[in-house]
Amino acid sequence: VNRKIIGCLVVLLSGIVAYGQKPPLLPEPVVAALAQETSGETAKRNLEYLARHHRMRGSRGFRAAAEHIAGQLRAYGLSDVRIEQFPADGKTMYGTQKARPAWDAEFAELWELRETASGWVPNVRLASWDAMPITLAQDSESADVTAEMVDVGSGTSERDYAGKDVRGKIVLASAQPGAVAQLAVERFGAAGIVSYAQNQPTAWSGDNDNLVRWGHLETFSDKPTFAFMVSLKHARALRERLARGEKIQLRAVVRAGRHPGFYDVVTATIPGADPRLGEEEIAFSCHLDHQRPGSNDNASGCVAILEVARTLSKLIAEGRLARPARTVRFIWPPEIEGTVVLLNARPD
């Protein structure tokens, strides 16, 4: 019996060792060439450029990022480099998805005012588009409003508004602006929203109360409005003052809005060498849109596949790597909706 057990262990361990010594998927010279050529520094330089832009769908910032990616692809020797454009007009249907119009902002500031003998004057700036674009919620519309702030808790249920007059005022809410606007603005007549919505309600939520989360409003709302985003730390201070009965007067100035534009989708290929298999494609895709500041979601992914494209193209051109049998395609769309647009407009 002992001999059988020992024999089984030998077979089992032999299998584990054999599995651990499994040869790599690629020949060692190819792996070495890829490791030598791939550059984290090059990827980081591209990331630094992308992260400078507030890259919302159809915006000037997104277009600048798309042109940078396309320019780099051409410089790296990729084929079929182009920026595909599809209407983002609020009307065109792509399958079951209605295109959202493009959105851009020129200016936005939120100030707390101080009362003086001559009237209310600016005292503390709470948010600035120029300093931090993420403080203006996406799909905000132009406004110039001076109004009192009212705390409405989450702002998503009728009980949040019980006994409170928010008409013509600016509400402070913990939920996303899009979830607050239906009651606060459309039903109860609030002039605008200040939100301190968190990225998610569990896990690390609240660990860093200085963070400002991206916010958004409903694109197709019948009653356009504006919203600013503030940190949890700032919101707590405002809530405490309001709870003590202090009057907080704000002035919000926004120059922003939706307009007909385009979904820009950057694409390029490394053509396959096989006449038959070359018609098939292996796709690398990362969404190019994101807010500024921020580099992880998903500028880091965008520059990662850009560096893959550069590395493969260079090694193939130098004869150090065989051209793949199938075509390799690289795609940089707006997140989700840009992919839906591309697949519906270009089903092939």
How would you name each of these model-derived features?
Residues 22-23, 48, 52-167:
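Noncatalytic luminal/extracellular "stalk/propeptide" segments of secretory-pathway proteins
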Residues 7-15:
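Bacterial N-terminal signal peptides
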Residues 262-265, 290-348:
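Acidic/histidine-rich catalytic neighborhood of metal-dependent amide-processing enzymes
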Residues 127-160, 215-296, 307, 314, ...:
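Soluble metallo-hydrolase cores and metallopeptidase-like ectodomains found primarily
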Residues 123-128, 225-228, 235-236, 333-348:
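Metal-dependent peptidase/peptidase-like ectodomains
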Residues 38, 42, 47, 51-61, ...:
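Sec/Tat-exported extracytoplasmic proteins
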Residues 20, 60, 123-226, 297, ...:
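Extracellular/luminal Protease-associated
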Residues 30-37, 51-60, 97-99, 136-140, ...:
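Second-shell loop/turn segments in exported
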